[in-house]
């Protein structure tokens, strides 16, 4: 399937998180699509997923929710990182490329991550499914 939006043209192919050894999750983005944000943390802990939860904290307005998400990370014993200088989807890509590379993935709903990724796969979470995204406008 192809998608065109204000950020470019993208190919989306169905995929699954089980195909990746580690995930870097853009928490604000994914949690916003769930009816209960705690479900993201609880289900990851119960499934034993190797994941890094990247939380937006680069603006004062993020802090109340960031504190809540950090508390959920602690409660469920998950690895969380604050993105204090840039949007979490971009920091997640940087962490993934630096720490893990091929075989790992960033999970987000934001296409900026696809444009920024070099070695890591980006999975777009839409309508309860994961889609491996490729930037078709690259090199065009």
Features from the language model and the residues they span:
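Metal-dependent nucleic-acid phosphoesterase active-site entry motif
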Residues: 1-34
